[in-house]
């Protein structure tokens, strides 16, 4: 019988009054209240059933009571007393079926003062439920509203902070902090979804036979945690271990992994790492005699990042991740180690491809400057982001971010929030979407100088960069790309000259060595005191490349001789494979020589090096002095005009051949020339700085001049007894 039939039995068919425990059941099984039976017997002098007219021969008092009615009435009384006693139901409430009937026929239920409620203490013991700790009115249309003390039936757990529940037949969402869970929901099985393909069987079958092979989007059952970076799972009928960073666990699996993390920390201390002497990037793990299974090693965050980088650079249609033998790095050392790749044959078009953000260690007195080197053929998946600002987590489910930190986004959590994993710490959490920005959104052009460097970053020491920055941003004059070659990089300490025009200032020049790879990534310096200068495949020249040649300065026609910017070439070996060496330009506001009286002190021998000249800047460019090699690009000799610096005697009119001499280099005197004279000079004027010891040593350089060159015009400078000669027609 349904609820409505049971409720009809509570009414007397004759007087329609409510029945109680004194009601009597006749032999025909019809039940009436006792007062109605007494009135019928008094009126007719006999007792017959008012429904079927069946005669009743026994006394009214001897008739039995309806046991079903008694039980129903007892249930009503127990339900009312339970509601007043603070049970899971409020007074006057009904079961779920009663709530549905109230929506279909509310008037009939309101007319009846009784509610049919079963014994809830017996039936609700296994039902997941929670008790409200405070009043909650909700902020969104889908939120559940309740008062303090209400009992809410739990339907499912949305995440760590939200539940979906039901009260009085109304479902909605509510925060977990507003209720006290009385009976927990049944936990789903610990599962995780594969984010990438994982297969190490082809690498080394003997070493990786215990690894679990899976494909992307496979669902794996998590069994336990092996160590900090590996877990044991089951896929189908296969059981094995797999890297945790390759999967996305659900809430149950995450709790299981976190619970076992503390237990495994003591076990990982007993594991010994044996590095291979033949290979610097592979290691094996020594297994103890009593271990149950072989653990291939701690799959560190560094190895995962390198694997992600290889996946990023793979073709877009490729989903298989090429995984090399895991690099075993101690989990207690989170510093990132770049694998050596000097022998890799990388084309020059791939220069500047993405590399993980690795802050290089610098000395305490040096700050760091970040240089962005974007490549022309870089492409990243859309889920790779970089933090624009630092973000501190306000809850256990949020992710701490540091400025410049890489993040892989797993998906959208809600409006304005993203869920992702940090590429530095490996933690998974949510964070605001306005704190991150996708990297490499512009792949073929350079970022604007006002925008932050969101591309592949390397860390420089400011000892190799001037205090005002020698890296020019987006110079329109330097639009032609340079070829990328292996160039020994020189380290320069720029020193501002405070001397006046009439005094002699000194600049110090310091050299260092650092290798640069073709793929744009940098090796760390062997000593923290030796800074690394970045030279990459750039469309603009960020700094100076110095070579131990005779110093040659080029000043374009129409540019005054006032010092603005100086480019010096200095090196120790010729460029490889016949490619032109990369020469970089320091702009006017960042010049290292700030007066004509400044000088440079060289510390190396002179080695002739063939190099291609720089592209000639337009005549409207700001004042600068560019390097002009001895041979022009097209091989055509043009008119050459010279300026020679000597101490006490005027230069002879014939040519001299340079001879290296030993001794202290002297500083050139201040160059004084009017702007019209400087403007009248040819576009290939060469300034020669000669090293002299004590007095005049006769050291000059061969000058190639056209046969049409006329007599030399001499201009003598009066400063410090120095004579300046300008040969011209």
UniProtKB/Swiss-Prot annotation:
Gene3D superfamilies in alphabetical order: SH3 Domains, Zinc/RING finger domain, C3HC4 (zinc finger)
Modification sites for Phosphoserine: 649
Reaction catalysis annotation: S-ubiquitinyl-[E2 ubiquitin-conjugating enzyme]-L-cysteine + [acceptor protein]-L-lysine = [E2 ubiquitin-conjugating enzyme]-L-cysteine + N(6)-ubiquitinyl-[acceptor protein]-L-lysine
Effect listed in the UniProt record for changing residue 643 to G: Significant loss of interaction with PPP1CA. Significant loss of interaction with PPP1CA
GO biological process entries: negative regulation of apoptotic process; negative regulation of JNK cascade; negative regulation of protein ubiquitination; positive regulation of cell migration; positive regulation of JNK cascade; positive regulation of proteasomal ubiquitin-dependent protein catabolic process; protein autoubiquitination; protein ubiquitination
InterPro entries: Endophilin_SH3RF (IPR050384), SH3-like_dom_sf (IPR036028), SH3_domain (IPR001452), SH3RF2_RING-HC_Zfn (IPR028511), SH3RF2_SH3_1 (IPR035792), SH3RF2_SH3_2 (IPR035794), SH3RF2_SH3_3 (IPR035822), Znf_RING (IPR001841)
Assigned GO CC terms: nucleoplasm; nucleus
One function term, GO molecular function aspect: ubiquitin protein ligase activity
Pathways involved: Protein modification; protein ubiquitination
Tissue specificity annotation: Heart (at protein level). Up-regulated in colon cancer tissues as compared to normal colon tissues (at protein level). Testis. In the heart, present in the apex, left atrium, right atrium, left ventricle and right ventricle, but not in the aorta.
Leading EC class: transferase
Residue intervals of every RING-type zinc finger in the record: 12-53
Annotated region (Disordered), positions in chain: 78-105, 258-297, 497-526, 610-677
Region (Interaction with PAK4) location: 370-459
SH3 domain: residues covered: 125-184, 187-252, 380-441
Function: Has E3 ubiquitin-protein ligase activity. Acts as an anti-apoptotic regulator of the JNK pathway by ubiquitinating and promoting the degradation of SH3RF1, a scaffold protein that is required for pro-apoptotic JNK activation. Facilitates TNF-alpha-mediated recruitment of adapter proteins TRADD and RIPK1 to TNFRSF1A and regulates PAK4 protein stability via inhibition of its ubiquitin-mediated proteasomal degradation. Inhibits PPP1CA phosphatase activity.
Family: Belongs to the SH3RF family.
The protein's name in its UniProt record: E3 ubiquitin-protein ligase SH3RF2
Organism this protein belongs to: Homo sapiens (Human)
